[in-house]
Amino acid sequence: MKITIAPYTDANATEITDLHHACVHAISPTIYSLEQQEAWAHTPPNYPYWVKRLALKKPFVAMVEANIVGFIELEENGHIDCAYTHPAYQKHGVMRELFAYTQNVAQKKGIKRLYLEASIVAKPFFEKRGFVSLSRNEIKKNGQMIVNYSMEKILS
């Protein structure tokens, strides 16, 4: 499977929005309840919100053939805001490729620190890539408490 990383275009907005929704709702309800998943990613998705968000964030997009299989957002200050892989492509190296690309871009820009808020399911991925957990957070989102972890990685 050949994974390519492409810049975001406005034509990607609906597919990325659907990917985000599918990712959140594919998490086992033993990790995040169905109510927490719905608070995190409404059904149906809020497409106008995501169109505006993605136009501002300009994520890096992972493609397999013509299909969007993942995306990651890197802000100028080193914050990674979103990092998602389509459920059908998880455990196939998509996020590994996206993260390696993102880290390379960050280093070329002179960013010294990457930081993020990782979900329970994403935390092990980032730990394997040198991130350390700074705190466990309980975030209230749409009436639900959602656990995530503030993490950082110092770049050399």
Regions found by a protein language model. Name each.
Residues 56, 79, 112, 145-147:
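Exposed loop/turn and edge beta-strand positions of beta-sandwich/beta-sheet ligand-binding modules
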Residues 115-117, 132-150:
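Conserved catalytic-core motifs of GNAT/GCN5-like acyltransferases
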Residues 2-4:
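Extreme N-terminal starter segment of soluble prokaryotic enzymes
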Residues 106-118:
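Conserved GNAT acetyl-CoA-binding A-motif
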Residues 126-127, 131:
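Conserved active-site tyrosine of GNAT-family acetyltransferases
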Residues 7-10, 18-88, 99-101, 121, ...:
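Acetyl-CoA-dependent GNAT
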Residues 93:
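Conserved G/P- and acidic residue-centered "switch" motifs that form tight phosphate/ATP-binding loops
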Residues 50-52, 72, 106, 140-143:
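Short secondary-structure boundary/capping segments
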